[in-house]
Amino acid sequence: MRLLHTALLLIVLPCSAQESVTSYWSGALSPTSIHIRARLSGPTDSVRVLACAPPCTEEIASPYTVADPSADLVAAIELTGLQPGMPYTYRFEVNGVQDASGIAAGSFTTPGFGAASFSFVTGSCNGSGSHPVWQAMRDKDPLFLLSTGDLHYRDPNSVEVEPHREPYREDVLSLSPMKEFLHATPIAYVWDDHDFCGNGSDASFIGKASAARAYREYVPHYPMHHPISVYQSFTIGRVHFILSDLRSTKTGEEMMSGAQLSWLLSEMLYARDNGLVAAWVTSLTWNSVGYPENWACQPAERSALNDVLFALGVKDIFIIAGDAHMLAIDDGANADFSTAQDLRYHYPIFQAAALARWGSYKGGQFNQGGVFPNPSAAHGQFGEVLVEDNGFDLCITFNGWQTDGVGAECGLVNSYTFCRTPGQILVGMPHPANGDLLCWYAGEQGLMFRVPDGAASMEVEITDATGRLVLRERRAADHGIMLHPLPRLSAGLYTASIRCGSERSVLRFVADSHR
């Protein structure tokens, strides 16, 4: 009898381990890493992810981590050492037993380094994870989902964390086809009001600390900069995504705190100085007038921000907004709220919502298609953004899609394409590890280098668009960050080749006529 009991345990235990992952999703995607959150049916200190790329001859394993009741049994897993531009599948190992059932098996594709083409889907205001809009988005085969808020409509506002956890557990990660979409598509996500602390919620709401805790437990996210707020940034290809949190520090006097505003401007300057187009995610509508629940409620703050961006020469921006339940596109002609109103730069706007909710209009003028509110609560709407990058011009297409309530049709509602030529084009790794060679174009200052440890000298060679040698210099290498001034250059495209010992970095940059 004892032998029979032992045999039964050997049969039952592996099945129990295979079923121990109850929900999961991925996010914080980069060329070499991804974060995964997995909720287990019980506590363990031995859970990890195993991933492979075709032909799957060897697997990459994450470090072991824990699923603890203090974090609602959610394990925070980071998978590193991935290859850029590769499709991966992953599965879980719990307590030494690998899940071979396929029930808990996810997938993602890493982006490439440097100039790269890709696509993503975007939207806000998700009324139901059972809506066919989730399958329609999956059919677009996006690199990731950019969620601009209201991922659920539970409106939690409690000093207790459980009411803020439950919507992730029950509404976001448990319903089909949403959960299958999230198994196959990484997410980048910033909250709005309904998934923060309820309709119209701001910094005064009592549940903000609980919302922050539940978000950090459940959501695979990029690095945070504040104990409560969830503003974050990341770069894919030559697009730098900047996600503003317009709820946790919002007051009757300001949309965002001074600390978040400083962070936002530093991220804009990072994009400007590193040859990137900035994709600014503002969950609330930017270009409305007279509405209390978006940027129209703080016209002075909006004008001041616009003035600073113009003054800093941050010209390559496009804006993605949610909250209003409608599809709409503007080429930037209606996005200028600067004091001078001189339309110095065009900042195109893509208003993409609602994933599954009835329609609404919250202001704004749009000259490239719209406004198109959801015709009914049964209709789903989302945005698709195509990024085409040939290494010089970067062209972006906004496609607005609408589905019916049964998934029979998914039709194109509006579309708009624009192109930009950022001031610098990186070829190779934009974010190498500390100690590696990195170079970027700093405008009138010249070229900036991060010099590898122990380097003795550097050789700089610059050619113009015809291949004519413009500059060749050799100089002693300083430690850390060093500046290499350039001679006055005619406006045009240039290629810089920098050698430092055995390392080489190549970048292309555009010198403007003001140098």
Give the location of each predicted region.
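Sec-dependent signal peptide recognition
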Residues: 1-9
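Selective for proline/serine-rich intrinsically disordered segments
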Residues: 12, 61, 67, 140, ...
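Hydrophobic h-region of N-terminal signal peptides that target proteins for export
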Residues: 8-17
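Metal-dependent phosphoester/phosphodiester hydrolase catalytic core
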Residues: 18-426
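C-terminal outer-membrane/trafficking sorting elements
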Residues: 430-515
